[in-house]
Design a protein with these regions (language model features):
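Outer-membrane beta-barrel translocator/receptor signature
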Residues: 1-43, 50-57
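Membrane-embedded beta-barrel scaffold of Gram-negative outer-membrane proteins
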Residues: 14, 29, 122-138, 245, ...
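Flexible loop and strand-edge segments within Gram-negative outer membrane beta-barrel domains
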Residues: 36-56, 64, 68-121, 130-152
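Short loop/turn motifs that connect adjacent beta-strands in outer-membrane beta-barrel proteins
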Residues: 20-25, 67-70, 116-122, 164-174, ...
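Outer-membrane beta-barrel transmembrane domain signature of Gram-negative proteins
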Residues: 101-108, 129-218, 351-352
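Surface-exposed extracellular loop regions of Gram-negative outer-membrane beta-barrel proteins
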Residues: 22-41, 54, 124-139, 176-182, ...
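Gram-negative outer-membrane beta-barrel transporters
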Residues: 213-216, 313, 317-321, 338-401
Length: 401
């Protein structure tokens, strides 16, 4: 493809699958290549869409030792280069501004499933691992100090039991319970900004849920218990869901769920953003607490036939209450003159809104789709977002960049 006759993009992909006649084993492989030249819409020398070069490869395979067991294997690799800014024929530190990343990602996983009693019960053991090697540059005005390197290793192991019951108290039900352990080791180095960060995150979890299925009503109740090594106490996260479906054309859903974000470094914290030609770094406050969320949502989904046409309307409302919400505040500059923003706990925030999706289709010949979302995100109290001439500027709006 070509954008405005200026920027070409090439894509090539392929896949192949092999399955045994008796379905005892199978494998699927895929490969893709994508290359896009930088796109400068207004000819000012700076890209609106950056340069992209990406290669991916992977496979999924399974083997059934018996009729009631299954082994799954998978592997994926991605080699991706992205660069935005100007002067693409020069090194990043020779340009006026450049944001550049090169990722080499390797991931794989394995699982073992064992069924019994005519597939009504199942035990699953699983594990996965991913390694990411990233080299980056985030800088402006020929900054030699903006190079960085990140090494990230994550692995997960766990087990799960699923049991189908003909009657559990008052209705047929499916019970799910399990244990899981996650480990993440991160090492991020950006010598120009005197940053050498090492972070080890370990999370041990237990989860249970039970889903009752009745003629018109489905009810799901579950909970998760997490022990995060950066949080002193256990985190309890319940959830409940109701689905009411009186007819094939109409259904309504109510959901309550909880969650948390740990006081740790996230991907966006590893970037050094260029604002006004200055580098801006993010650090964590010493007494940072976890961010907790309570989310409520409800929706109605209605389908009908209008002659030869089929129509569908989905209306959804959502509300999320955030406690100890993460906010960023200026705390000055470092020895290199770069701005430092600190992630702290704010007073709280609310995110709420409505979503509307409408579809109209005439078989496979034509389809029209309309979507609309109205959302508002507000802090409970005004939070400081920047300083101008020593004066703190506050806002209740959750800023987005």
């Amino acid at each position: 493809s070509c954008m405005d006759g200026k920027s070409w993009e090439q894509y090539m992909g392929g896949n192949v699958s092999l399955v045994a006649k008796d379905n005892s084993y199978g494998i699927a492989l895929y490969e893709s290549y994508r290359n896009r030249n930088p796109y400068d819409r207004d000819d000012d020398g700076f890209s609106e869409l950056g340069k992209l070069n990406m290669n991916t490869f992977g496979f999924r395979a399974y083997y059934r030792p018996t009729h009631f067991s299954r082994i799954n294997l998978e592997y994926h690799t991605t080699n991706e280069f992205r660069r935005g800014g100007n002067k693409f024929d020069l090194q990043p530190h020779e340009s006026d501004i450049t944001e550049q990343t090169k990722h080499i990602i390797n991931s794989g996983g394995a699982s073992y499933d064992l069924f019994w009693r005519e597939y009504k019960h199942k035990i699953s053991l699983y594990g996965s691992i991913q390694h990411t090697d990233r080299n980056s540059y985030y800088g402006a005005q020929q900054d030699m100090n903006a190079y960085g390197k990140t090494d990230d290793l994550t692995w997960v192991a766990g087990g799960m039991y699923v049991g189908n019951m003909n009657n559990c108290f008052f209705a047929p039900a499916t019970f799910t319970g399990g244990l899981e352990y996650q480990n993440n080791s991160l090492h991020d180095v950006m010598t120009g900004y005197h940053r050498d960060m090492k972070q080890d995150v370990r999370i041990a979890s237990a989860f249970v849920q039970n889903e009752w299925k009745m003629r018109q009503l489905t009810m799901l109740v579950g909970a998760r218990l997490d022990k995060h090594n950066l949080i002193d106490k256990l985190i309890f996260s319940p959830r409940i869901n109701f689905l009411y479906k009186p007819t094939e054309d109409f259904q309504a859903r109510l959901t309550y769920s909880t969650g948390f974000r740990a006081p740790q470094a996230y991907d966006e914290d590893l970037h050094v953003t260029a604002v006004g030609g200055e580098g801006v770094q993010i650090k964590l406050a010493d007494n940072l607490r976890e961010e907790r969320s309570n989310s409520y949502s409800g929706s109605v989904d209605w389908s009908t036939h209008l002659g030869h046409w089929q129509a569908n309307i989905l209306l959804e409302g959502f509300y999320t209450d955030l406690r100890h919400v993460f906010v960023l505040e200026d705390i000055g500059k470092d020895d290199n003159g770069d701005k430092i923003k600190e992630r702290r706990n704010g007073s709280g925030a609310r995110v709420y809104g409505v979503n509307l999706d409408a579809k109209l289709a005439h078989g496979k010949e034509a389809q029209f789709q309309l979507g609309f979302t109205a959302q508002r995100s507000r802090y409970m109290d005004a939070e400081v977002w920047t300083k101008v001439d020593g004066e703190e500027l506050t806002t209740k709006r959750m800023m987005r960049t």
